[in-house]
Amino acid sequence: MSAYPKSYNPFDDDGEDEGARPAPWRDARDLPDGPDAPADRQQYLRQEVLRRAEATAASTSRSLALMYESEKVGVASSEELARQRGVLERTEKMVDKMDQDLKISQKHINSIKSVFGGLVNYFKSKPVETPPEQNGTLASQPNSRLKEAISSSKEQEAKYQASHPNLRRLDDTDPVPRGAGSAVSTDAYPKNPHLQAYHQKIDSNLDELSVGLGRLKDIALGMQTEIEEQDDILDRLTTKVDKLDVNIKSTERKVRQL
């Protein structure tokens, strides 16, 4: 069962301290009776609806700021994964080059086992050495899915700067004027411009949240693909290093036998 009685409004939790209990929900029945009671109830309901709309708009704006912040963290993590991929690929190329050099050394060792035949073969058919590849000549690229996700999210960086709670205040850029609760005494609910503005703000924030969550999903899926591909590189690298270690030990034994 709920921890709060039925008279409490759960939406009050958003704007208050975590340790505080939510304010009780009030409606027209809580107002005193009297000659002006119907007008007071109507006035109160208008103000209450407007206050709730304002709180909801503020809540969605905070959620939007957190979404952009999460997206920025996701982009930074994705870029770090891309750099890690470059390190792994360069390491794999270095191991391949070491293996190639070791094979050439083994051929030389086998050739000089016979003094005459080894010298003849060595000068007659010297193995063609492949020039070593320069590290960093080609920039490593992440998988296409992650690359597209990073590019799409970086286009939203300006929105992140505009919505970050440490860089702006909600009332600095909101089109809804502050203190609107006192301006509804003569406005009918369907025609209240302040309420309409809050609704537009809420709808806009929810639309941006929906699109932003889609981008976050793309980043997550791209990172998953990138991690899986890097796992494959690590598996190949581990196998090559183990094989290289065996060949090095074998070459050492052959050198000692000369």
UniProtKB/Swiss-Prot annotation:
GO terms for cellular component: autophagosome; autophagosome membrane; centrosome; ciliary pocket membrane; cytoplasmic vesicle; cytosol; Golgi membrane; presynapse. It is found in: Cytoplasm; Golgi apparatus membrane; Cytoplasmic vesicle, Autophagosome membrane; Cell projection, Cilium membrane. Residues 76-107 form a coiled coil. Residues 132-144 have a biased composition (Polar residues). Residues 196-258 form the t-SNARE coiled-coil homology domain. The modification Phosphoserine is found at residues 77-78, 114, 163, 182, 185, 204, 210. GO terms for molecular function: SNAP receptor activity; syntaxin binding. It is a peripheral membrane protein. The modification Phosphothreonine is found at residues 130, 137. Signal peptide: none annotated. One of its GO terms (biological process) is cilium assembly. Residues 18-32 have a biased composition (Basic and acidic residues). Keywords: Autophagy, Cell membrane, Cell projection, Cilium, Cilium biogenesis/degradation, Coiled coil, Cytoplasm, Cytoplasmic vesicle, Golgi apparatus, Membrane, Phosphoprotein, Protein transport, Transport. Residues 1-41, 127-190 are annotated as: Disordered. The keyword Membrane applies. Gene3D superfamilies: 1.20.5.110. Belongs to the SNAP-25 family. SNAREs, soluble N-ethylmaleimide-sensitive factor-attachment protein receptors, are essential proteins for fusion of cellular membranes. SNAREs localized on opposing membranes assemble to form a trans-SNARE complex, an extended, parallel four alpha-helical bundle that drives membrane fusion. SNAP29 is a SNARE involved in autophagy through the direct control of autophagosome membrane fusion with the lysososome membrane. Also plays a role in ciliogenesis by regulating membrane fusions. PANTHER family: SYNAPTOSOMAL ASSOCIATED PROTEIN, SYNAPTOSOMAL-ASSOCIATED PROTEIN 29. Forms a SNARE complex, composed of VAMP8, SNAP29 and STX17, involved in fusion of autophagosome with lysosome. Interacts with multiple syntaxins including STX6. Interacts with EIPR1. Interacts with STX17; this interaction is increased in the absence of TMEM39A. This is Synaptosomal-associated protein 29. It comes from Pongo abelii (Sumatran orangutan). The gene is SNAP29.
